[in-house]
Amino acid sequence: MTTCDEQAAQSVIEYLAKKGHTSIGVVGGNLTETEISFRRFTGAKWGFKNSKLSFNQRLQYEPCRFSMEEGYQAAMRLLNRNTAITAIFAMSDLIALGTMRAIYDMGKRVPEDISIVGYDGIALSRYCVPRLTTVQQDTTQLAKKGVDLMLQRINYPYHATHKTTPFHLIEGESVIELNGDK
């Protein structure tokens, strides 16, 4: 039982593109170690393609573990390598919070200089300044359906199923609409 990570990540990139961002970075995950990272990265690539935006993995992607410190370090590397980035999709809210701090420490502002979208909808995202725009997963439904699937698996061990639960893009204050000035 999961959120459809590909679809959610795709919607983030398309959302940023509709806001006028054409140089979007992606921070987080390790594509060879976690399935979640791979699915979110795949969805982000779909978003670039659907929005007719170019994506150069070497210039626009920086892997990291799912923590604030790793997000901070990855964002510093990415933004030092590619100064044209106007928005970042962080593969988790913790990565996004570290990224926000890196942006601030580089003398830039969120969202005025660089917009950011996280993923998970953790409570802290509502209390940081600015409030984080994030993909919110229905954790209550994920837990309930996960238990149901586990019990089903115990009773019917050869009947594998995979289900997804809806996601919502929660608009905070961390994304700005570009008007052509950047």
Whereabouts are the PLM-identified features?
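Bacterial carbohydrate/catabolite-sensing allosteric modules
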Residues: M1-K182
